[in-house]
Structure formats: structure tokens, C-alpha cells
Amino acid sequence: MSESSIDTLKTMLANLDDAKKYQSLRDVMETLPAPDLAAVFEDLPAEKLPVLFRLCPKDLAADVFAELTPATQQQLIDGLTDTELKAVVDELFVDDATDLVEEMPANVVKRILAQAEPATRRMINELLKYPEDSAGGVMTTELMALRPDMTVAQAMDTIRENGFDKETINNCYVTDSSRRLVGVVSLRALVLAKNTEEPIKDLMDSNVVSVSTTTDQEDVSKLFEKYGFLAIPVVDAENRLVGIVTIDDAISILQDEASEDIAKMNAIGPSDKPYFKQSMWDLYKSRAPWLLFLMISATFSSLVIRGYEDALAAVTVLTAYIPMLTDAGGNAGSQSTSTIIRGMAVGDIQPHDLPRILWRESRVALLCGGTLAVCNFAKMLLFDRIAAPVALVVCLTLICTILLSQIIGGILPVAAEKLHVDPAVMASPLITTIVDTTTLLVYFNIAKALLHL
């Protein structure tokens, strides 16, 4: 039903200037969840954004706004009056409002803060003190806190009275008089409690998994993956409860980290903008420096070839198999690197596992290299009609190349981790250049030894 409603909405937007369509448009919008409405907004030209946003049901407007990309949010803010902007900011959860302030240019930030309530402004400024990629930077302060001496009935009354403005009430956090975190109790436990006079301290779980305000956001997201939480409490250095990180933020973190790693692994500067929201200049800046670096690095391969020109001149057929050998080596190295980086990202592999990594990769490389060499040897003899000694040179090089490539692919991510460099930045872009040069050196030296060049 959602897909058909989206299609209907897009069709109606084509005739947005027809005033009779506005009520029908609002009716369709009321049937759509916030993420689907936000997807429609992303496809609209800037001048139509405020018009459609004003038709949003009041209880949905802030949720739709929070789902938009920063670029679209800025376009929409530019088209809203101060009164309309104030209504949006007041309805945003404080972590979403903080994200908005972090993403906007200074002139827009001044306007946002000017429209925010003093209490909201204080909370935003408090969250902005933490590093952007830390638990403190992504947490929200809108949580449900209870006291251990409360009864179940008192706790339920507190939740009914204050829960509407909280980001989640699935878990309620129990704090002492100094706001130190002492336990957690689920809404389920409160609802199902048979004795409404039972104190919270008898129901709560005192073994609470929490994170510090300075914990890296990627480490926080791993805890969600490990424990299946919907929220994780955040405490300061004195174990005082200062906020929570919710599952929606954890999912966003995982998506951002994955996008960043994929970009880095392919030698592209990461960007938080969608592809079609990036200008040609943005795309150029994210790619050109890496391409230039890799082009310069590739000159090592040219130097190797120039150093063995006599061998190539004597047996020119060797030249024909250089692309196949370097491609096979690069592919094998990339497979190894990607596997190790992924293992390190999910915690399966640690730097001290390097000896085990090399032992496993070596055995896999010999199996893969042997299989490729046998197939290639038969192809060269039967189809290419190449002399057996030359075929032997190529196939021995193929085995050595696969072996060296997978060993290098296993070492680079671990070395990057030891040097406190992102493995995706160091390992993936460099693997092809290193393997190409290594492959050529092995190839020409085997050729010189076996063909007596």
C-alpha cells in the first residue's frame, strides 16, 4: 500500500499548482510513514519543498524533516518562515536537532538556535561539546529515568506523565540521588508486574551494559550488534547517566561506517552526501588525489619493465601474459585484504592473529594458485600453442603471484591497524600497486632463470 501511495503522491505533485489537489494531497500524505515521505521530498525541486512540507500532518512533520539529507534540510529551511522553523525545531528530538546544527553552515545554525527553546538550546550546546564520532556526540538526553525506591505504580504514573517527549520508553534507567546509573528496568517488566507496590530496585537489572561519552561510535554500534539492544545508556567519568544511544542512531552509524569503508577501499574520499547531491567538483575532489597518487605509484611497474627490456625482446611472447598475471595477483590480493578488513571490523580478527592469518592465507593461495596454474598451462599448450618452457614460466609465476598477493593482502590491514591507520585507507588502494610490481619482478626473474635470458 505504501508503494502505491508514493506513486499517487508523485503523480499529484506533477499538478501541484492546482489548488483543488491540496486536500487530496494531504490525505495521501497522512497514509505514508515518515521515511517514505522523506524519499519523495528528496526528489522535489527546492521551490516545491516548503509547499509540500506545509501540507505535512503536524505530528509527522518533524519526523519527515529528521529523515531528510542535510542538503535537502538546508533547502527546506531556506523556504520556511521563522515561525515554521521554530515549530519544527521544537518537535525534533535533541539528538536530531544537534545533528542538524552540526551539518548546517553558520548562518543557518544561528537561525536555528535563535528559534529553539532555551532548554533545547542548552541541551544542543551540551551535546556539541562531545566529539562528533563519540557516544556523547550521537546520544540523546531525552530518556526515561526512574528512582530505585519508586513503586511500580509510581513508575507507571511517571512514564504516563513524561514519556510522550522521550525518544524511547522501552527501557527505563534507574539512577540514585546523584544521577549515577544503578540499573535498568524494561517497560515489559513494569506492565507485567503483579504487585504494583513492589519497589523498582527489586525488578531492575543492576548489571547494566553502558558506554562512556568518549566511546567511539563504531564501538557503540558493535554493542548493539552483539547484545541486540534497542538503546544503550551513556555515562560520564563518574558513572552519572547523561544520555542514551538508540538503535536508529546505531543503524545510521553502521551505514555511514560501511559507506566510508567502501569509498576508502576503492580509493575515493568518503562523502556523507547522496551521489546525485554531490557536485561535479565534489566528485572530482574525492577521486583525483587518489588517482594521482596511484598513478605515481604505478611508475614502479614501468621501471621494472624497463629494467628487463632485454628479456622481453628475446622472448616477446612473455609480454602478452603480463596483464593476466598482474590482474590475477591484484584480484587475489584484494580478496585477501577484503576478507581480513571485514574480519577486523566485526572483531573476528585481531592484530596478534597475524601468524595464523599468514598460515591460512598461504595454504589457500597454494590451492588457488595451483588450480589456476594447471588450467592456464593446459590452455597455453592446447589453445595458445605456446612452447612448454614459456608456459611453465607463466604458470610458476602465477602460483608465486597468488601466494605473495594473498600474503601481502593479509599483512597490509594488520600493519595499518598497528600504525593506527584505517585499514581500508592503507590496504585496499595500495594492494594493486604493490602486487603489480612484485608480480613483474617474480615473472622476469623466473623467466631469466628458466629460459636462460
For the regions a protein language model found, what residue spans apply to each?
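Hydrophobic, small-residue-rich transmembrane alpha-helices and their short perimembrane loops
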Residues: 304, 317-335
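Membrane-water interface of transmembrane alpha-helices in multipass transporters/channels
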Residues: 307-321, 384-396
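Juxtamembrane "helix exit" motif at the C-terminal ends of alpha-helical transmembrane segments
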Residues: 295-312, 375-386
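Hydrophobic packing positions in regular secondary-structure scaffolds
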Residues: 1-269
